[in-house]
Every structure is written in structure tokens, then in C-alpha cells.
Amino acid sequence: MKGRYNLMIYVGIDIAKLNHFASAISSDGEILMEPFKFTNDADGFQLLTSKLESLALQDDSLIIGLESTAHYGDNLVRYLVASYFKVCVLNPIKTSSMRKNNIRKTKTDKVDTYIIAKTLMMQDSYRFVSFYDLDLMDLKQLGRFRQKTIKQRTRLKIQLDRKSVV
């Protein structure tokens, strides 16, 4: 087990609407966790974290990567950051170029988890999601909600004006 403490663990998570897939590889390329499916809810998140906690030798030896995808992964990212995991949201363009380098051109959720983990492993530096980033996500969401509400209010005022003219 000499040198085992320098081992980094890279977790790739493929995000989808209802279910996500995750796998883990070591910095020497060994598959530590075969791809498995978990639900996009608290039960699924707890399943994931229990598997991750059994892998990590040290708190800083595990890095989680996932592609930036709409809003489907937001709750998972919040959960993982709140659980003090290091989470890195990857640009899909980077994973796409890694996918092109893959010998097998198949695109499945299970294969994508490895590609995401390998993309993470090849990074020179990481930008981890912080609590500040989560606050910014909330602020953006509130801004979009405000814009939508103002638009709806304007539409209703116009309808009200039309009805009062008649």
C-alpha cells in the first residue's frame, strides 16, 4: 500500500433529468467504482455519498466532476458542496473532445461517467464550486423569476385594460 496516500480519486457523474450515473477511477487509471445509477433526489444523493465516503482515504483525495447541464444537476451540486465534497463543473466542450479521443465512439451514460472522470484527471487546474457560487446560482434564479413575474404582470395589465375598454 506504499504511495496509496498520494492516490487521487476522480468521480465522473453523468447528469440527466430523473437519474444520474457515477463511476470512479484512480489517478493511475484503475476503476474503483463501476458506473451505477442513482436517482435525482435525496435518497439517490445519499446513496452516492455513502459510496464516495467508502472510497476516499483522505478528505482531499476525491474530486467530483460533472458536465454543465441546464438545471438538472443543480440540486446534486448543492448537496455535494454542502457535504464538503470538491465539485468541479466541466465545460461539455472539454468532455466532447475527450469523447472524440476515445477508441469506442459509443455514447452511453455509463461510458460518459468514465469520460467525465478522465477529463477531470487531465485538467491542469480545477475551479471548485463554492458556497459563493451557490449563492450566485440562487441570485440568477431569483432574477429570472423576477423577469418572468414582471412579464406576466404586464400581460395581465394589458388584458385588464382591454376588458375595461369593452
Model-derived features: where do they sit?
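Short, glycine/acidic-enriched loop or turn micro-motifs at the edges of active sites
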Residues: 17, 70, 94
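Short glycine-rich, Thr/Ser-proximal phosphate-binding strand/loop in the N-terminal lobe
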Residues: 17-43
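Short, basic/hydrophobic alpha-helical segments
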Residues: 43-61
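Short glycine-rich phosphate-binding loop at a beta-alpha junction
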Residues: 60-69
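Short, well-ordered alpha-helical microsegments
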Residues: 72-77
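Long, charge-rich intrinsically disordered scaffolds of nucleic-acid metabolism proteins
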Residues: 88-166
